[in-house]
Amino acid sequence: MRKNDFDVREMNAALGILKLAREGRGDSDEPDTRTRKTTFQMMVLKEVFKIAPHPSTLTKADLALMIKLPLKAVQIWFQNERSRKERGGRLGKRTRGGKSESIDPVRLFKVIMKVLEKNREGLGF
């Protein structure tokens, strides 16, 4: 077995555990409130948007778990970002009304690690 295969299985197992933990919480009856995103979360969202302006529901759910945001906040962020880009004319015709794209959780993790490294360099760690 290759080392990379083990990493993928390990990542999928960890993601499964996070999903089970989130399922147990359920939706509350509290009114929706605006979710404040950290600089790190915003950087990750922007990097993922560069790869997939229309991520699949599963990709958004995985991303939400990985960066500790509610799924609804991630869905709304992508919707708003596409709208901003379309208004500014910066979203190509290929991406307007495009099909949803799935991103492998390992690739998402690599994007997050890349942003983390950039953050560390900027903060002088």
Swiss-Prot record:
It is found in: Nucleus. Residues 30-89 bind DNA. InterPro entries: HD, Homeodomain-like_sf. One of its GO terms (cellular component) is nucleus. One of its GO terms (molecular function) is DNA binding. Keywords: DNA-binding, Homeobox, Nucleus. The keyword DNA-binding applies. Coiled coil: none annotated. It comes from the Eukaryota. Its main location: nucleus. This is Homeobox protein HD-8. The lineage of its organism: Eukaryota, Fungi, Fungi incertae sedis, Microsporidia, Unikaryonidae.
